[in-house]
Amino acid sequence: MLSMGQRGFWDEQERVAKLQEKKPVLTRLTESIPWESFRPLLDKGYSQERKSNAGRKRIDPLILFKMLVLQQLFNLSDEEVEFQVNDRRSFEEFVGLGVMNDIPDATTVAFFRERLRKAGVIEELFEMFEGYLRDQGLEARGGQIIDATLVPVPKQRNTREENKDIKADRLPDGWEENSNRLQQKDLDARWVKKNGINHYGYKNSICIDAEHGFIRRFVVTPANIHDSQMLPMLLDPENQDNYVWADSAYSGQCFADLLSLGGFESRIHEKGSRNHPLSEAAKERNSVRSAIRACVEHVFGCMTTSMGGKLTRKIGLERNEAWWTLKNLTFNFLRYLQRSTNALTLA
């Protein structure tokens, strides 16, 4: 007999049913994203020869992939995602595990991501979902919007001489002999000053299509690489319309010539100078362009507020490229859901 305040089996069933009625984002991701179509790529990246059939059975790579997606949804470390899958029913159900299953530990998650990175599979996962979007009638249309956001990483505690060597692409004295220390040093992250504030880390430059708002192309670079240098790599020739929107960092005759050569029509913000201020007509054109260009700011806003922020704790350009490929892919998952409703509740 249940005492006052105790919950019975039917109470628990009713609780689960009420939670499912809310259709939280993890439930909708489970139902809407073609997870099984990723399996061949995941198997290719995670395949490894077994010397015998003894030992622990290999974990389903789809479970591990969903844990990587959870990391990006909430900006979790490997240790945090292990804990949260253990702690939260919704996380456990999303990855496809039950209370009687063992949860993959942080080391397994990190090892899986590294195997995918080294096999070049993470980029293929992004491209595969891009193909799925096209098959669903969500081709890139309406022109493209290009922008970049700074990606902060933990600051390195180096001496002035060590930083000088790193900036000159030289390995500081003594680091090569100390492999443990070298593994903890980021030789690729760089400082950059923006609006009078110093930032340390990387940069995620993206191209979204103006009609649907999906990330179609992206490039991850050290923070000191100027936004405009990535323009040739970001332009999407598959967009069905030829307009290109970007802020004034991408302005200049050389970029105008590049767009013209590629058959694109520039909608890049015009930039004035000390002796040649913008005319009223140019200011009006910029105002109209800003209304459209704001769509790309919504992408970065989602990553900052809804996806746990942009701080990344990976070391080196290659690992940050892998991390942000997964981040951009996960954003596209959310954007795919958002097309059916504006209500996304991550909890």
Predicted regions and their residues:
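Charged, often Cys/His-bearing segments associated with DNA-binding zinc-finger transcription factors
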Residues: 1-44, 339-347
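Secondary-structure capping and boundary motifs in well-ordered enzyme cores
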Residues: 34, 55-63, 101-105, 288, ...
